[in-house]
Amino acid sequence: MNLSFFDQFSSPHLLGHPLILLSLLLPALLFPSPGNRWINNRLSTIQLWLLHLITKQLMIPLNKNGHKWALMLTSLMTMLLTINLLGLLPYTFTPTTQLSMNMALAFPLWLATLLTGLRNKPSASLAHLLPEGTPTPLIPALILIETTSLLIRPLALGVRLTANLTAGHLLIQLISTASIALKPILPTVSILTMAILLLLTILEVAVAMIQAYVFVLLLSLYLQENI
Amino acid sequence: MPQLNPAPWFSIMVMTWLTLALLIQPKLLTFTTTNPPSKKPSLITKPTPWAWPWT
């Protein structure tokens, strides 16, 4: 019973095929690939506006060299956003709750930012290991601490997304289970629980968007240090 | 907790990156941003007529 709440996070299989492939591929259908001769409609206009806004927000703090990453970061944001939001539908599986997927995204991208810095301006990116104005006796300890914080970044990036989405889905399931279980005994409390569930769902929609943004924003901040 | 189980991590990684690189990126590249609407009237050019030398 205790474990069954976590069953929603186990990757589903159908006839021996993992359905995580489908849930990775399907969110891409939300975005059409408009040709040159397409007439604008409301959907494509609002998508274009959103993509423009995301790209602008991500590229403002970066300098010109970092603008090559615009496509990478924007498409990553789009993918995470669509997967997170579609995963909030009932009876669907969210691939971004899987730690292996988030680490698979976080680790190579973090490594790319690090290697870009070490390749293009090694002394400047190594200088981030020591904050300016540190008292001399503290230097060895601080370098150790900063190195650890540099190396722990991909782990934190992946775990953050996993933990936030997992917690949200768990809370939704807990409260809805409580609401169903309370219905025969305490109808009033059950209705109140439903109201809380509604509010929580709104919060989770916000969390799904915010966490996708935070993932990409942190990557762009790591990039900013290194470019 | 099954979400922490890294079981088919390699196929998940390959699928994720293939989706990102082959599906989402080409789709986003086809979006072309339009200019923001401006109130200024577009410049109307008035070509001056000339006479052809052979007429």
Curated annotation (Swiss-Prot), chain A:
Species name for this entry?
Anas platyrhynchos (Mallard)
What does this protein do, in the record's words?
A: Subunit a, of the mitochondrial membrane ATP synthase complex (F(1)F(0) ATP synthase or Complex V) that produces ATP from ADP in the presence of a proton gradient across the membrane which is generated by electron transport complexes of the respiratory chain. ATP synthase complex consist of a soluble F(1) head domain - the catalytic core - and a membrane F(1) domain - the membrane proton channel. These two domains are linked by a central stalk rotating inside the F(1) region and a stationary peripheral stalk.
* Keywords tagged on the record: ATP synthesis, CF(0), Hydrogen ion transport, Ion transport, Membrane, Mitochondrion, Mitochondrion inner membrane, Transmembrane, Transmembrane helix, Transport
Which family does the record claim for this protein?
Answer: Belongs to the ATPase A chain family.
Q: Which Gene3D superfamilies does the record match to this protein? A: ATP synthase, F0 complex, subunit A
Kindly list the places in or outside the cell where this protein is found, as annotated in its UniProt entry.
Mitochondrion inner membrane
One GO CC term, this protein:
mitochondrial inner membrane
Describe, as the record does, how this protein assembles with itself and its partners: Component of the ATP synthase complex composed at least of ATP5F1A/subunit alpha, ATP5F1B/subunit beta, ATP5MC1/subunit c (homooctomer), MT-ATP6/subunit a, MT-ATP8/subunit 8, ATP5ME/subunit e, ATP5MF/subunit f, ATP5MG/subunit g, ATP5MK/subunit k, ATP5MJ/subunit j, ATP5F1C/subunit gamma, ATP5F1D/subunit delta, ATP5F1E/subunit epsilon, ATP5PF/subunit F6, ATP5PB/subunit b, ATP5PD/subunit d, ATP5PO/subunit OSCP.
Q: Where are the transmembrane segments?
A: 14-34, 69-89, 98-118, 139-159, 167-187, 190-210
NCBIfam families given for it? Answer: ATP_synt_6_or_A
The identity of this protein, by name, is ATP synthase F(0) complex subunit a
Q: Which gene encodes it?
A: MT-ATP6
Q: Name one Pfam family in it.
A: ATP-synt_A
Curated annotation (Swiss-Prot), chain B:
Q: Does the keyword Amino-acid biosynthesis apply?
A: no
Q: In what way does this protein cross or attach to the membrane?
A: Single-pass membrane protein
- Residues spanning the membrane: 8-24
Alphabetical keyword list: ATP synthesis, CF(0), Hydrogen ion transport, Ion transport, Membrane, Mitochondrion, Transmembrane, Transmembrane helix, Transport
Q: Which GO terms describe its cellular component?
A: mitochondrial membrane; proton-transporting ATP synthase complex
- Provide a GO biological process annotation: proton motive force-driven ATP synthesis
Q: Name one Pfam family in it.
A: ATP-synt_8
Identify the domain of life.
Eukaryota
Q: Where is this region: Disordered?
A: 35-55
Where is the protein found, in the record's own terms? Mitochondrion membrane
Q: Does the keyword Cytoplasm apply?
A: no
Instruction: Output the InterPro entries linked to this UniProt entry.
Output: ATP8_metazoa, ATPase_protein_8
Q: State the Gene Ontology terms under molecular function.
A: proton transmembrane transporter activity
Q: What does the protein in this record do?
A: Subunit 8, of the mitochondrial membrane ATP synthase complex (F(1)F(0) ATP synthase or Complex V) that produces ATP from ADP in the presence of a proton gradient across the membrane which is generated by electron transport complexes of the respiratory chain. ATP synthase complex consist of a soluble F(1) head domain - the catalytic core - and a membrane F(1) domain - the membrane proton channel. These two domains are linked by a central stalk rotating inside the F(1) region and a stationary peripheral stalk.
Give the record's subunit note. Answer: Component of the ATP synthase complex composed at least of ATP5F1A/subunit alpha, ATP5F1B/subunit beta, ATP5MC1/subunit c (homooctomer), MT-ATP6/subunit a, MT-ATP8/subunit 8, ATP5ME/subunit e, ATP5MF/subunit f, ATP5MG/subunit g, ATP5MK/subunit k, ATP5MJ/subunit j, ATP5F1C/subunit gamma, ATP5F1D/subunit delta, ATP5F1E/subunit epsilon, ATP5PF/subunit F6, ATP5PB/subunit b, ATP5PD/subunit d, ATP5PO/subunit OSCP.
Which family does the similarity line name?
A: Belongs to the ATPase protein 8 family.
Q: What is this protein called?
A: ATP synthase F(0) complex subunit 8
Q: Which organism is it from?
A: Anas platyrhynchos (Mallard)
